[in-house]
């Protein structure tokens, strides 16, 4: 057993020697010097003493303080708020069990003493009250005893009668005094009882003595004056408590009763309805409808849109009456209110000029109008629809000039719908092109007759028969070949054949017998719309029927307004416009979509109601289409990487150009990159457009528009990419280049040379060295290689050493021998092939 001195023990426990000796003396050990030996038993004794002393200190009462802080916000008028902080502090003191027991014992003794004192006092009061009552009864019996004895006595005997007279007179006075004393004692008793009850309630015990005394008091103390008061109190308490409460309950009871049978509701179902709306109309919970449809085998959610037939089936199965309504009921009622009555008259034909780009459509129309309009278009290319009416020698004709570029498919389709006759312009030296075929398809779909104008007939190489052959393939047969389509040879530059073309157009118009009602309210179609900075929304309208006048309230798609001003195609103000007349109108609350129908309505309230309805319907259709697209593509996009997206904010001068550019740009891209037009509109580039581009990391494109000062400032500060264009080709080409750059590059491997192993040598520096013959290409040093055995790749690494004879070589050409050392590979065998290649990055294209 190892012996330890006091000094060594002090060093071990890291305590001063004097303190350790003092603790050992307190523990009863005989150690007084630092050199004395301490045994294990003495160590145990010292440890026990220290533990007991620490425990006694730990068991002393300790005070615990808890602080709690609560912060809340108090809102005052406006957007102001006040922060309220509540701090609470609680102190807990742990007391010894002896103190707690002593306090409980003391409280119990005090409670018992108070109960005994209250009981003695109450018993004394009851005893005194009983004695007074007995004395009062005795006095009453003494006063009543002489009254019957006075009747048989004769009248002269006055002395016996006079003796009890004072007693009879004093009886009521003593009775009143006794009643007052009893009343005072009763009040005092009631106060004592209430105090006793409060004490019992505070101590948590039931007032047993008070209840017994109270019962006795009610039974034994029916005093004459206290009884009416008690009755009043009881009746008043009953009136205020029980009676009043019951009457109040009766007044507050509702007359609703649960239905004894199923309630049949009248359910109105439109063309589409959500599950929650259907449940609300049937007065059931949405979960019940969802559960019912699950039982029918159709899993739905509470916000899912149901068609009319499904909703009708559900409502009828649940026992309700169904009323089907059309979503277009509001528009139908508006159409019925519009009356087109009056005498019909012949109207001018609306002619649309179609054809491929640069085939001379605008130049031909320009020659007809005797004005140089094409010079105003960028690059001589029509960017949006132009509407003009022309007075010719043979009558008035309205022309619509549509763009020929591939991006303007929707604009050409709208032009075909709004027109009566289509002039198909085909260049004699170019033939039938893609947009020519598309124009033929639009004309056939709209059921509009065609007049073919073979333009540029004065150029060398013009071949009319070739045009006839190519168009006959598309189903357009010339009159010379037995068809019904007139072919006219024209030259927009020289004016050749223009008169014959107009004659053919007017002949077709006479065959169609075009009529209109000028006296009816105006009705037309939106050819184009734009946002003018000074005049607001401007819409180009082609009046198809009736007369449009300044001041009319019009409904145009999802927009409405009063016509504040009308301008003709030359910019001159006009008061009214008849059938087949194109005009620009001002006063709408927004820019309508090209192709929207315009109607004159009599009531502004009705116009606003229908416009708001159409806006909501358009929003619902858009959301439904987006939801359907997500459901259809959920499995196709599962597991695919996220596409790289080029965000664009696009602003144009007219609505048609915006739609065309959105369609063209949206069609660009592939599985890896895409174009997303996050913001588009008509008008100049504003500060909000620049902020949108900044927030979404987009490129700003302006087509025939410019940015204002606020937008330019943001573009300069943030370094945004903003570009101006006036030709649609440039936008599409730049976006294609940007997408090509986003695609990155591909890594392509080019095989530089192949060497065949003829022998294997051992080198102390490089290990196995392959003696090879270059059989193809050139072998280079420090290039990646592959080792092929039986045309199977068994190793891929790097060519570390290349020598010819004893000299290092940078390259060895075909037909020459060399020694090749492969880095980190020694399993080279005779007959293997070493293939040297390089990796080249190649730019990708769309």
UniProtKB/Swiss-Prot annotation:
Stretch list, region G2: 380-384
Biased composition (Low complexity): 136-148, 158-176
Protein name as it appears in the record: Translation initiation factor IF-2
Region G3, annotated ranges: 401-404
Biased composition (Basic residues): 240-253
All copies of domain tr-type G, residue ranges: 346-513
Region of interest called G1, as start-end residue ranges on this chain: 355-362
Domain of life: Bacteria
InterPro entries assigned to the protein according to its UniProt record, in alphabetical order: DNA-bd_dom_put_sf, EF-G-like_DII, IF2_assoc_dom_bac, IF2_II, IF2_N, P-loop_NTPase, Small_GTP-bd, T_Tr_GTP-bd_dom
Subcellular location, record wording: Cytoplasm
GO molecular function per UniProt: GTP binding; GTPase activity; translation initiation factor activity
Keywords, comma-separated and alphabetical: Cytoplasm, GTP-binding, Initiation factor, Nucleotide-binding, Protein biosynthesis
Region listing for Disordered, in residue ranges: 94-263
């Amino acid at each position: 057993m190892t012996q330890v001195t006091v000094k060594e023990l002090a060093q071990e426990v890291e305590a001063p020697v004097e303190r350790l000796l003092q603790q050992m003396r307190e523990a009863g050990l005989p150690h007084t010097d630092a050199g004395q030996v301490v045994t294990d038993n003495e160590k145990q004794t010292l440890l026990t003493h220290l533990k007991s002393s620490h425990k006694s200190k730990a068991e002393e009462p300790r005070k615990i303080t808890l602080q709690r802080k609560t912060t809340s916000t108090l809102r005052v008028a406006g957007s102001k708020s006040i922060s309220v902080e509540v701090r609470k502090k609680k102190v807990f003191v742990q007391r010894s069990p002896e103190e707690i027991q002593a306090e409980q014992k003391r409280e119990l003794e005090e409670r018992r003493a108070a109960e005994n004192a209250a009981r003695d006092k109450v018993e004394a009061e009851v005893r005194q009250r009983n004695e007074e009552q007995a004395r009062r009864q005795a006095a009453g019996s003494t006063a009543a005893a002489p009254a019957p004895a006075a009747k048989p006595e004769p009248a002269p005997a006055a002395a016996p009668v006079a003796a009890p007279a004072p007693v009879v007179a004093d009886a009521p006075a003593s009775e009143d005094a006794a009643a007052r004393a009893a009343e005072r004692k009763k009040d005092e008793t009631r106060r004592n009882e209430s105090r006793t009850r409060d004490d019992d309630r505070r101590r948590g015990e039931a007032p047993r003595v008070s209840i017994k005394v109270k019962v006795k008091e009610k039974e034994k103390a029916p005093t004459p004056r206290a009884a009416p008061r008690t009755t009043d109190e009881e009746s008043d308490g009953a009136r205020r408590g029980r009676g009043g409460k019951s009457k109040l309950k009766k007044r507050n009871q509702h007359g609703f009763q649960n239905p004894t049978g199923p309630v049949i509701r009248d359910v109105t179902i439109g063309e589409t309805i959500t599950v929650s709306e259907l449940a609300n109309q049937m007065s059931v919970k949405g979960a019940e409808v969802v559960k019912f449809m699950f039982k029918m085998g159709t899993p739905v959610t509470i916000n899912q849109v149901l068609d009319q037939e499904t909703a009708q089936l559900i409502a009828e199965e649940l026992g309700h009456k169904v009323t089907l309504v059309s979503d277009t009921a509001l528009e139908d009622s508006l159409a019925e209110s519009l009356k087109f009555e009056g005498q019909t008259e012949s109207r001018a034909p609306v002619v649309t000029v179609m054809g491929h780009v640069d085939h001379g459509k605008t130049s031909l129309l320009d020659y007809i109008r005797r004005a140089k309009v094409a010079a105003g278009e960028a690059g001589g290319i029509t960017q949006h629809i132009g509407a003009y009416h022309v007075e010719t020698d043979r009558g008035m004709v309205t022309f619509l000039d549509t763009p020929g570029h591939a991006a303007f498919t929707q604009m050409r389709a709208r032009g075909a719908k709004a027109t009566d006759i289509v002039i198909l312009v085909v260049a004699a030296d170019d033939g039938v092109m893609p947009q020519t075929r598309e124009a033929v398809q639009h004309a056939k779909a709209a059921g509009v007759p065609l007049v073919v104008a073979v333009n540029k007939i004065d150029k060398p190489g013009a071949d009319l028969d070739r045009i006839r052959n190519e168009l006959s393939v598309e189903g357009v047969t010339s009159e010379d070949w037995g068809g019904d389509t007139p072919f006219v040879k024209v030259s927009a530059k020289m004016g050749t054949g223009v008169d014959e073309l107009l004659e053919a157009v007017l002949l077709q118009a006479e065959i169609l017998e075009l009529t209109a009602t000028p006296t009816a309210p105006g009705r037309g179609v939106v050819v184009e719309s734009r946002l003018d900075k000074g005049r607001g929304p401007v819409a180009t309208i082609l009046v198809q029927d009736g007369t449009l006048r300044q001041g009319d309230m019009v409904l145009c798609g999802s927009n409405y307004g009063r016509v504040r001003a009308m301008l003709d195609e030359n910019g001159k103000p006009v008061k009214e416009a008849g059938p087949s007349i194109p005009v620009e109108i001002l006063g709408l609350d927004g820019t309508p979509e090209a192709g929207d129908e315009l109607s004159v309505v009599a009531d502004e309230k009705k116009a606003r109601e229908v416009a708001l309805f159409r806006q909501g319907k358009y929003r619902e259709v858009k959301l439904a289409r987006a939801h359907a697209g997500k459901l259809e593509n959920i499995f196709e996009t599962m597991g695919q990487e996220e596409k790289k997206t080029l965000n664009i904010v696009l602003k144009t001068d007219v609505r048609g150009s915006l739609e065309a550019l959105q369609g063209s740009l949206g069609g660009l891209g592939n599985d890896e990159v895409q174009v997303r037009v996050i913001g588009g509109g008509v008008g100049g580039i504003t500060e909000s457009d620049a902020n949108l581009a900044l927030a979404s990391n987009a490129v700003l494109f302006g087509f025939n528009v410019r940015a204002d000062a606020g937008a330019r400032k943001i573009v300069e500060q943030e370094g945004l990419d903003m570009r101006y264009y006036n030709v649609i080709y440039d936008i599409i080409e730049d976006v294609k280049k940007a997408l090509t750059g986003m695609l990155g590059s591909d890594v392509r491997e080019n095989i530089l040379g192949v060497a065949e192993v003829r022998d294997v040598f051992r080198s102390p520096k490089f290990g196995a060295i392959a003696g090879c013959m270059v059989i193809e290409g050139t072998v280079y040093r420090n290039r990646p290689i592959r080792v092929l055995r039986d045309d199977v790749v068994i190793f891929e690494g790097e060519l570390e050493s290349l020598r010819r004879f004893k000299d290092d070589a940078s390259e060895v050409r075909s037909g020459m021998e060399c020694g090749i050392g492969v880095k980190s590979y020694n399993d080279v065998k005779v007959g293997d092939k070493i293939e040297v290649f390089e990796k080249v990055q190649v730019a990708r294209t769309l």
